[in-house]
Amino acid sequence: MKIVVSSEGRYLSIRITDGTLIIGRSSSCNVTLQDPILSRQHCALTRDVDRVICTDLGSSNGTFLDGESI
């Protein structure tokens, strides 16, 4: 399964396999983006059979999916 992440007008295609991916600014994240709006550990993407669950990890600016806050 593949998703697209938008950050500062750029788009990043991410393939999600089993397990959880952490997105954020920290080098400890699976996906690191140097966007000042992102928290060090911003959100988690977890694949669940035929869908992806996005969980905000207490980020300062929130996490949005198709313009809607989650």
Regions found by a protein language model. Give the residues of each.
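Forkhead-associated
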Residues: 4-6, 10-70
